[in-house]
């Protein structure tokens, strides 16, 4: 591994607040808010920051603004220019100044007094929920329908018995579903959590300006929906605790029924949690559960009608990879349906970003190694609490994005020209199999005709809800602060995999920090860089080896090479991936374009077409689309790739060729028909642009040169390594398909593929050991299903895979492998 990548000079003055109290080692006794940043001029600048002033003199970026394109009215709502300057606050730092009392006794009882003064009472929460849900027309119809199915030809008396039986079943379901919030339990839990959080977290930081926006939203007398990313089981308690501390009523939390365990389930119910099935629609026999769906719909409608707040985890389950997973919009669809029926005037949506230095679960190595997930139990919860009390988990940062109007979003989408989304098969097959008949291209073009805006149209409704879910998750992910462990893990895996001196690691940490801030992401730490790096190394524990070198009396830091340790480091490294993912996609696409050019022996090997690079990158975005939300749904991959190439030009990594150089391009290069190998929708053109836009049809394609400077080349290499594990997993899965003999049940195939990847890692064939995580195995197989490599059928509720007719020929499977390998930098 080239140890000069991201070379970035000497050290240090970190992104410091004026108050020295906020260094990592002293944040237990930190002041309530972080001040403005003091600075000295940095001795060095990074590869991409040469084009702008050092960030040492600028304020923290304010994250979480809503989308101006989709919700322009919400953009100015709740926000004012003073909001960003309100600074951060450590929620678990409580003393007498946070109460109405002063003196020695107040200092001793500050936690009790603080909890007692919080505004929480029974009248805040929903009443008569079970009765109102059972009496709703939709539930009554569902009960009658299910009863009729149970007794299709019975007498009136038998029908009445069937109805009563179904009603009893409905009441039993609602007992599990409906929460009975207890203000006393919220207060008690608040006090316990204040004690516990102070024992195993350094701090829990929130932005006071963001909380001001949330408070302003609560005064609108509308229901609020909090939609956080899901990293840990602590997420359930964290939001309720923060809102309680700020006198905002607790939300009703949608929890998976895997947490419905004795004693613990009672606590969750008392705090506002309600349990739902993992799959909303299915009964044990695989049929649609009309009754359950009606009860869930009625429950959500009743809570929203009573202006209650909800907390929904769109990812459905905790992320095992450290990345924000793709959205599961089942429960969100119920919220949208409620608003569409005009039951309530509006709903305010609040995405929430949550970042941990270290999650309390520590890692998910067991599941990533293919072991079955252990069911939660009271004993496992107790063991988890005991384990937590013996460790420190560093810092936590919670960011509340700007609330936006769901009604405004839905109305704006209904008025926009909306094209049917391009499937992965339509987007990628023409690039993978260019000699194949272009029916997929024609299909994609036909689908671009504007469809009916009738909200009753099912396909439009599904697309609308899916886009909304992606919008929310992208904003929540963009709001997540980057933690010290994320940066250190990333540097050790993709910058210094062979190890590095501590002083150099600190220098690169400092620069990575500036790179993150330059891209308008916030940091979840502050203090001297050396202290912060040591803090992160301590938290990463056995994943890192520290040795003392007598050569220069330095500490040498090396990432552990064992598979579980690499998996764990990759989990934390993925916390910073979304900051650089678009640039990493451009870097890998740049390699693919240059690699193709090199094999063909073009006359001007130093020049590449900007349009070709953008389209290549857009296709890679499609390939990686199962790895999470890459962009806002109101943007296209073509658009964001074009913008990212523009940033590369700003950085100086790419330069626009002089006119004389462009005129010397050989006809073979200028007339390449690569554009005919991709569907037209990949060539994005906005309907809102002027004729003079840079994207105008008259614009001539320009040609670019790649900077040959050492630091630019090293930065490109670093970006390419970030996607290395993903691309290696996908290419290895493509190799494994060569010996496919089906049909095969999907669970069995996943197990075999995962075993193959683990064997590659154990035999040290794999470049990146983290390419063998079970998450990447599942995503690779899903991608193959989406592009039409596999046909999927259901047999006894089990998904069965077999090769599609397109990929039965071995040559087409080879082309799939070659296409993926074109992006892989060896």
Swiss-Prot record:
Intramembrane residue windows: 88-118
Enzyme class, UniProt record, top EC level: transferase
The pathway to which it is assigned is: Phospholipid metabolism; CDP-diacylglycerol biosynthesis; CDP-diacylglycerol from sn-glycerol 3-phosphate: step 1/3
The answer to whether UniProt assigns keyword Membrane to this entry is: yes
**Topologically, how does it sit relative to the membrane?**
Peripheral membrane protein
In this UniProt entry, the residues modified to N6-acetyllysine are: 778, 782
UniProt motif (HXXXXD motif) ranges? 230-235
According to UniProt, the reaction catalysed is:
sn-glycerol 3-phosphate + an acyl-CoA = a 1-acyl-sn-glycero-3-phosphate + CoA; (9Z,12Z)-octadecadienoyl-CoA + sn-glycerol 3-phosphate = 1-(9Z,12Z)-octadecadienoyl-sn-glycero-3-phosphate + CoA; sn-glycerol 3-phosphate + (9Z)-octadecenoyl-CoA = 1-(9Z-octadecenoyl)-sn-glycero-3-phosphate + CoA; sn-glycerol 3-phosphate + octadecanoyl-CoA = 1-octadecanoyl-sn-glycero-3-phosphate + CoA
This entry's Enzyme Commission designation comes to: 2.3.1.15
Instruction: Please list where the region (Important for mitochondrial localization) is annotated.
Output: 80-120
Q: Where in the cell is it found?
A: Mitochondrion outer membrane
List the ranges whose topology is Cytoplasmic. Answer: 1-87, 119-826
Name any Gene Ontology BP term. Answer: phosphatidic acid biosynthetic process
Alphabetized UniProt keyword annotations: Acetylation, Acyltransferase, Lipid biosynthesis, Lipid metabolism, Membrane, Mitochondrion, Mitochondrion outer membrane, Phospholipid biosynthesis, Phospholipid metabolism, Phosphoprotein, Transferase
Cellular component, GO annotation:
mitochondrial outer membrane; mitochondrion; plasma membrane
Role played: Mitochondrial membrane protein that catalyzes the essential first step of biosynthesis of glycerolipids such as triglycerides, phosphatidic acids and lysophosphatidic acids. Esterifies acyl-group from acyl-coenzyme A (acyl-CoA) to the sn-1 position of glycerol-3-phosphate, to produce lysophosphatidic acid. Has a narrow hydrophobic binding cleft that selects for a linear acyl chain. Catalytic activity is higher for substrates with a 16-carbon acyl chain.
The similarity annotation says: Belongs to the GPAT/DAPAT family.
The identity of this protein, by name, is: Glycerol-3-phosphate acyltransferase 1, mitochondrial
Species: Sus scrofa (Pig)
């Amino acid at each position: 591994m080239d140890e000069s990548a991201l070379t970035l000079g000497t050290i240090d003055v970190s992104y410091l607040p004026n108050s020295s109290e906020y260094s990592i080692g002293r944040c237990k006794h930190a002041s309530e808010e972080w001040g403005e940043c003091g600075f000295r001029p940095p001795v060095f600048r990074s590869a991409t920051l040469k084009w702008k002033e050092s960030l040492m003199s600028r304020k923290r970026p304010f994250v979480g603004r809503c989308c101006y394109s989709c919700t322009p009215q919400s953009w100015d709502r709740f926000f004012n220019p003073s909001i960003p300057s309100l600074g951060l606050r450590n929620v678990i730092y409580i003393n007498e100044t946070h109460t109405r009392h002063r003196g020695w006794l107040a200092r001793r009882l500050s936690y009790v007094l603080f909890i007692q003064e919080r505004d929480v009472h029974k009248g805040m929460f929903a009443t008569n929920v079970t009765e109102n849900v059972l009496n709703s027309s939709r539930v009554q119809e569902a009960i009658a329908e299910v009863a009729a199915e149970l007794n299709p030809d019975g007498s009136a008396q038998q029908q009445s018995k069937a109805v009563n039986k179904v009603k009893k079943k409905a009441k039993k379901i609602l007992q599990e579903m409906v929460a009975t919030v207890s203000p006393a339990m919220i207060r008690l839990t608040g006090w316990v959590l204040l004690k516990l959080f102070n024992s195993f977290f350094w701090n829990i930081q929130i932005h006071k300006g963001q909380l001001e926006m949330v408070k302003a939203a609560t005064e609108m007398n509308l229901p609020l929906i909090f939609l956080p990313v899901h990293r840990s089981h602590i997420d359930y308690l964290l939001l309720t605790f923060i809102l309680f501390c700020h006198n905002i009523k607790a939300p009703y939390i949608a929890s998976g029924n895997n947490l419905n365990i004795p004693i613990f389930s009672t606590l969750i119910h008392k705090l506002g949690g309600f349990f739902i099935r993992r799959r909303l629609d299915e009964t044990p026999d695989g049929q649609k559960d009309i009754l359950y769906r009606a009860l869930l719909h009625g429950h959500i409608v009743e809570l929203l009608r009573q202006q209650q707040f909800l907390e929904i985890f769109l990812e459905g389950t905790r992320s095992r990879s450290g990345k924000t997973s793709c959205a599961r919009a089942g429960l969100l669809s119920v919220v949208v349906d409620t608003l569409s029926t005009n039951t309530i005037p509006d709903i305010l949506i609040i995405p929430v970003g949550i970042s941990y230095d270290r999650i309390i679960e520590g890692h998910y190595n067991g599941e990533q190694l293919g072991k079955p997930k252990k069911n939660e139990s009271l004993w496992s919860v107790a063991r988890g609490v005991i384990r937590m009390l013996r460790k420190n988990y560093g810092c936590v940062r919670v960011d509340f994005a700007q609330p936006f109007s769901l009604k405004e979003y839905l109305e704006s989408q209904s008025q926009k020209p909306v094209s049917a989304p391009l499937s992965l098969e339509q987007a990628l097959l023409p690039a993978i199999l260019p000699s194949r008949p272009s029916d997929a291209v024609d299909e994609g073009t036909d689908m671009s005709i504007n469809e009916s805006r009738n909200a009753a149209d099912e396909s439009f409704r599904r697309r609308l809800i899916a886009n909304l879910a992606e919008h929310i998750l992208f904003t929540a992910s963009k709001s997540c602060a980057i933690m010290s462990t994320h940066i250190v893990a990333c540097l050790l895996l993709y910058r210094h995999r062979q190890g590095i001196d501590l002083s150099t690691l600190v220098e690169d940490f400092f620069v990575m920090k500036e790179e993150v801030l330059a891209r308008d992401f916030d940091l979840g730490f502050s203090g001297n860089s050396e202290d912060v790096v040591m803090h992160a190394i301590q938290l990463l524990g056995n994943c890192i080896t520290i040795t003392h070198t007598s050569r220069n009396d330095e500490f040498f830091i090396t990432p552990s090479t064992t598979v579980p340790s690499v998996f764990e480091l990759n989990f934390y490294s993925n916390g910073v991936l979304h900051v650089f993912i678009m640039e990493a996609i451009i870097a890998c696409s740049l390699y693919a374009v240059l690699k193709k050019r090199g094999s063909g022996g073009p006359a001007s090997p130093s020049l590449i077409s900007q349009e070709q690079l953008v389209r290549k990158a857009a296709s890679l975005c499609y390939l990686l689309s199962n790895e999470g939300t890459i962009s806002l749904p109101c943007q296209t991959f073509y658009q964001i790739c074009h913008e990212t190439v523009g940033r590369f030009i700003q950085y100086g990594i790419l330069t626009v060729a002089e006119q004389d150089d462009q005129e010397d391009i050989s006809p073979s290069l200028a007339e390449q028909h690569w554009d005919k190998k991709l569907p037209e929708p990949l060539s994005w053109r906005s309907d809102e642009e002027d004729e003079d836009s840079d994207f105008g049809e008259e614009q001539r394609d320009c040609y670019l040169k790649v900077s040959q400077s050492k630091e630019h080349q090293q930065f490109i290499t670093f970006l390419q390594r970030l996607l290395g594990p993903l691309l290696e997993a996908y290419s290895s899965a493509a190799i494994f398909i060569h010996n496919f003999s089906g049909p095969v049940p999907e669970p069995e195939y996943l197990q075999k593929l995962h075993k193959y990847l683990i064997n590659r890692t154990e035999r040290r064939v794999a470049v990146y050991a983290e390419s063998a995580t079970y998450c990447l195995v599942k995503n690779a197989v899903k991608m193959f299903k989406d592009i039409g490599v596999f046909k999927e059928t259901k047999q006894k509720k089990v998904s069965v895979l077999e090769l599609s007719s397109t990929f039965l020929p071995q040559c087409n499977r080879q082309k799939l492998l070659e296409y993926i390998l074109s992006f892989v930098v060896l």
